[in-house]
Structures are given as C-alpha cells and as structure tokens.
C-alpha cells in the first residue's frame, strides 16, 4: 500500500487547503460546491425554524463560547466538512 502522508495536500490547515482549492479550481466546480454548501445551510436553517428550535439553537451557540469540548467537536465537524468539500471539488476535476 502506498504512503500518501508526505503529499503536500495533506500538510497544513485543512481550511487553508480548502480555500486554495476553491479559489484555484475551475469556476464551475467551485460554484457547484459552494451552492451545495449554501443549500445545506438553508436546509438546516429552515429545519430549525420549522421545528421551533431557534431558542435551543441560540442557547447551543452561546454554549460554544465557554464549552471547550463542544468547540473541539465543532472544529472536528468543520474539518470533516472541509475534507468532504475538497473531495467533491477534486473528484469533479478529474
């Protein structure tokens, strides 16, 4: 099995890598991925409103300021999203 750990794409901050990929990939691929992310955000916001979860969400967001474990979970989730997003763009670039 090949060792890919030395590849440049796996070095550094995933969010910085995502920014590089979004801004340097084809405009069509970047646009498609950004629209997918916006649709997901709109879906989540609509769900929160429809289920009357605004107060619960705001309370959760406030807890983020003081809860280090929650901050780590959010950062981990953000990294997962960034990696998936990069994969979506790069796989469309083949």
Residues of each region from the PLM?
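Short, functional C-terminal segments
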Residues: 1-6, 11-12, 16-17, 83-94
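Charged low-complexity stretches with an acidic bias
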Residues: 56-94
């Amino acid at each position: 099995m090949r060792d890919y750990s030395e590849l440049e794409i796996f070095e550094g901050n995933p969010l910085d890598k995502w920014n590089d990929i979004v801004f340097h990939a084809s405009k069509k691929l970047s646009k498609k991925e950004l629209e997918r992310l916006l649709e997901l955000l709109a879906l989540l916001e609509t769900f929160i409103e429809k289920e009357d979860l605004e107060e619960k969400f705001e309370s959760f967001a406030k807890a983020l300021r003081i809860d280090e474990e929650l901050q780590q979970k959010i950062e981990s989730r953000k990294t997962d999203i960034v990696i998936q997003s990069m994969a979506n763009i790069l796989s469309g670039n083949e």
